[in-house]
């Protein structure tokens, strides 16, 4: 049997299988697990759709969260998405959040590391590489799981991502 341990910041690993790396996330009705021979992180976020009347309030609430936790470039990108009257701001917010969470899971820093210390956006869109001053560089891969969800995998290098739907009840 393999013993599950936790790293300094809570990242789980198998003591008896140091070559096996995994990351898990769940949101809404989905659960995801990423497995690799290299360190990685995965995060899933359900975008919580509300009616049109609540959309402005929701945009304002997410804007306050972005101002507090996002890097200035990410906050700029999010803000630019709120200007056109569409709901692009919703996808932008949750894509940024999923990317940031997947990075801190990959790096092993956990969410205790201030999200504002690194950016997954250049201010105009999302980036596919992260180069923070405090941790290892990484690649990001955004995946389509289901409409209404943001899913991001992060690792030092990403050559291929295979998705298996286990279809469990």
Where are these regions (language model features)?
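Core catalytic alpha/beta fold that binds nucleotide/phospho-ligands
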Residues: 1-169
